[in-house]
Swiss-Prot record:
GO terms for molecular function: WW domain binding. Keywords: Apoptosis, Endoplasmic reticulum, Membrane, Nucleus, Signal, Transmembrane, Transmembrane helix. Can induce apoptosis in a caspase-dependent manner and plays a role in p53/TP53-dependent apoptosis. This is Protein shisa-5. The proline-rich region is required for endoplasmic reticulum localization. It comes from Homo sapiens (Human). The chain crosses the membrane at residues 106-126. The lineage of its organism: Eukaryota, Metazoa, Chordata, Craniata, Vertebrata. It comes from the Eukaryota.
Length: 240
């Protein structure tokens, strides 16, 4: 029996896979560095071309160079003694004190100084606003109040008394006499506390006539006298 012929549906994907397969070297190759120029290998996207001493990247398949230890073996005598291993060279570059940039040290010092200055200013501001800080208590301490004693002398002045009115006496008052009001600023005249004794009563008539006083020649005065009439008395003269 003959083998079955594969269907065209299976052949078409196989042809596509063969056509889409990348050419050799498309995934990239690692070229060994040239002697004396670089100590690290170089990755190329296409191929490595050149010789053992000088390799470079290229895309020409005809110039492709395949490196191998047997082909590019280097005798030990040709290796210079001054070349240091990669590990030692890296450690020397890493920890060598002269390799550091001087500007980096200046920047670090400047950053530390600015940080200390900002922290000092913030601390002072917090101390002046917080009641538990010593600077706040020192600035807010109450100042001693100096009290001055002033002595006040009180002078007891006599209370001004109203002018006293002289007491009126019994009997008829004199029409021509007018009481003078007290002058302002002048003390009133003191008056006795006791009233003066009353005037004796005026007799109803003149005294009786005695013959002994008139000498015997005088005529006898009638015993009966008319009653006393004040209208017959002279009117008092007004005081000037």
């Amino acid at each position: 029996m003959t083998a079955p012929v594969p269907a065209p549906r299976i052949l078409l994907p196989l042809l596509l896979l063969l056509l889409l397969t990348p050419p050799p070297g498309a995934r990239g190759e690692v070229c060994m560095a040239s002697r004396g120029l670089s100590l690290f290998p170089e990755s190329c996207p296409d191929f490595c071309c050149g010789t053992c001493d000088d390799q470079y990247c290229c895309s020409d398949v005809l110039k492709k160079f395949v490196w191998s230890e047997e082909r590019c073996a280097v005798p030990e005598a040709s290796v210079p003694a001054s070349v240091e291993p990669v590990e030692q060279l890296g450690s020397a570059l890493r920890f060598r004190p002269g390799y550091n940039d001087p500007m980096s040290g200046f920047g670090a010092t400047l950053a530390v100084g600015l940080t200390i200055f900002v922290l000092s200013v913030v601390t002072i501001i917090i101390c002046f606003t917080c009641s538990c800080c010593c600077l706040y208590k020192t600035c807010r301490r109450p100042r001693p109040v100096v009290t001055t004693t002033t002595s006040t002398t009180v002078v007891h002045a006599p209370y001004p008394q109203p002018p006293s009115v002289p007491p009126s006496y019994p009997g008829p008052s004199y029409q021509g006499y007018h009481t003078m009001p007290p002058q302002p600023g002048m003390p009133a005249a003191p008056y006795p506390m006791q009233y003066p004794p009353p005037y004796p009563a005026q007799p109803m008539g003149p005294p009786a006539y005695h013959e002994t006083l008139a000498g015997g020649a005088a005529a006898p005065y009638p015993a009966s006298q008319p009653p006393y009439n004040p209208a017959y008395m002279d009117a008092p003269k007004a005081a000037l």
